C-alpha cells in the first residue's frame, strides 16, 4: 500500500496525478506516514469482515476488495475538501484508473490477509468500518 502510494504520488503512474495535503501529517517522499497504517488497518478490517462470510476464499477476497473500494469511492470526493489529498484539477476528481489500480493494489493485500487468516476481532472491524462509512457519508452532505 505505502509503496504504491510513494510511486503513485511521485510519478502519477499508478492512481493518476495527485498530491497529499497537510491534514494527514508527517510525510515521507511526499506520502503521509499514516497512509501505510491506513492501508494495513483498512485491509485488515475489510478482510476480517469478508472472511466471516461463509463463501469460498476467492469470493471472500473479492468482497474484501469491494469493501475497500466502497470506502475509497466515498472518501475521494471529500478528501480535497479537508486537504487530505487532491487529484490534478483538470481531471475533475479521481480518474477511473484510480479505482481500478486501487483494487489491483488491494487484491494481493486481501489475498495475503484472508489466505493467512490474519483476521481481527469482527465486532471491532464492523464498528471501524461502519464508523468510517458514517463519518465520510456525513461529510459528503456538509
Where do the model's predicted regions map?
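Aromatic-rich, lipid-facing transmembrane alpha helices and their immediate juxtamembrane interface loops
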Residues: 1-142
